[in-house]
Amino acid sequence: MVELQELYKKTITPALQKEFGFKSVMAVPRLEKITLNMGLGEAVADKKVIERAMDDMIKISGQKPLITYARKSEAGFKIRAGWPIGCKVTLRRDRMYEFLKRLISIAIPRIRDFRGLSPKSFDGRGNYSLGIREQIVFPEIQYDKVDAIRGMDITITTTARTDEEGRALLKAFGFPLKDESR
């Protein structure tokens, strides 16, 4: 069993059950999935950009990403419907917990000028989204082999019903959220 998964079952679940007064252990919020998305607008000019981005995603997530395609043509962006414009990965179970551990302990502290994650990035239903500007914060990416700095969106989906429950869950995992009072 993964370290964070064990922490969740033994420590976080009883603490959240007591804090929010859940009668059943199954009512306690838990992580459902983590989605990584990389939008690649520059792929319009060079098709190799998608391949390089997919290689980065494989190294970061440990599984093959799905290529996302443009749904409709957009003349302003010079995009046609059906063209590849990004890639995404959905992590669940063990890979999700492994990724979360690396994100919290290694990647987030390596972000330049980092002062904590915004507590305003919850969506109203306990899910949290954050953007990373550089993929090089992950140790799996070798800086000298990077062709371009690419960012990505990371969405952490939970079973929490409110932002307060989601915030408590992520704080219990050690997520570096800023205090809301500031």
UniProtKB/Swiss-Prot annotation:
Q: Which UniProt keywords apply?
A: Ribonucleoprotein, Ribosomal protein, RNA-binding, rRNA-binding, tRNA-binding
The biological process GO terms on file are: translation
Q: Which GO terms describe its molecular function?
A: RNA binding; rRNA binding; structural constituent of ribosome; tRNA binding
Write down the superkingdom of origin: Bacteria
Functionally, this protein is described as follows:
This is one of the proteins that bind and probably mediate the attachment of the 5S RNA into the large ribosomal subunit, where it forms part of the central protuberance. In the 70S ribosome it contacts protein S13 of the 30S subunit (bridge B1b), connecting the 2 subunits; this bridge is implicated in subunit movement. Contacts the P site tRNA; the 5S rRNA and some of its associated proteins might help stabilize positioning of ribosome-bound tRNAs.
Protein family according to the UniProt entry: Belongs to the universal ribosomal protein uL5 family.
Its protein name is Large ribosomal subunit protein uL5
Gene behind the chain: rplE
